[in-house]
């Protein structure tokens, strides 16, 4: 398997940002880490090994990004607006710096996939919904898609609202976005077992919104034995990859 340990300077975040590449060909899969995780986490917890057959066949190549969650949504000493503004800086890094860097490394200029587990699933779905011109496939595993989970009630703060998928999706009526959502491949999965309860309300609210807006998506509920844990994500990711058009 082709592996590269990479880094580049981010002007938006004013620091060196680290990322790893796994694979030599195929659609680019941008991976967001779980809560406070690093660019090494996806490999360390066996997700790359779980998807090895897809990588070695040249069907996908993974790029695992660094996180700034500890300075944004997990920075509980900040007020909600400042948490959201740090996330916005990270968004600018991803879209304006990381994605061009990855494209330059690979020569891939078609639509990308994004994925993540737990908080990474929140990022994956949020980035897809905000940038469906960049990401045309998403696999979100065990996420919480409501910004209130991180900041509490936020009233009319637009910076938070614009990063709370269960809220802004209801008011997304722009045909440019809706058309791209309808053309995309979307998987949102949750288990019903231990530690999955936090994500269930937003999972069902999202499903309702997608249904009402006639956006095709696979909202997959796995069983009551399926916990919020890497053991299950290692099973889910290759399963869903096997059902997407790669």
What label would you give each PLM region?
Residues 1-246:
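Non-catalytic cap/lid and distal C-terminal segments of serine-dependent acyl enzymes
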């Amino acid at each position: 398997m082709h592996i590269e340990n990479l880094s580049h300077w981010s002007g938006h975040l004013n620091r060196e940002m680290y990322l790893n590449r796994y694979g030599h060909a195929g659609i680019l899969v941008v991976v967001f880490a779980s809560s406070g995780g690093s660019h090494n986490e996806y490999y360390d917890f066996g997700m790359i090994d779980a998807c090895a057959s897809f990588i070695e066949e040249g069907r996908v190549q993974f790029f695992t990004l660094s996180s700034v969650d500890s300075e944004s949504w997990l920075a509980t000493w900040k007020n909600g607006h400042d948490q959201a503004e740090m996330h916005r800086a990270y968004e600018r890094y991803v879209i304006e710096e990381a994605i061009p860097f990855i494209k330059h490394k690979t020569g891939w200029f078609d639509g990308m996939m994004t994925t993540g587990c737990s908080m990474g699933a929140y990022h994956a779905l949020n980035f897809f919904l905000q940038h469906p011109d960049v990401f045309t496939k998403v696999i979100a595993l065990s996420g919480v898609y409501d910004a209130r989970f991180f900041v509490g009630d936020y009233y009319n703060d637009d910076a938070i609202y614009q990063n709370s998928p269960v809220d802004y999706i209801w008011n997304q009526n722009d045909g440019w976005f809706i058309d791209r959502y309808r053309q995309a491949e979307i998987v949102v999965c949750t288990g019903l077992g231990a530690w999955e309860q936090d994500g269930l309300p937003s999972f069902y609210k999202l499903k309702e919104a997608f249904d009402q807006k006639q956006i095709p998506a696979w909202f997959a509920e796995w069983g009551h034995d399926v916990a919020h844990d890497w053991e299950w994500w290692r099973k889910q990711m290759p399963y869903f990859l096997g059902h997407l058009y790669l």
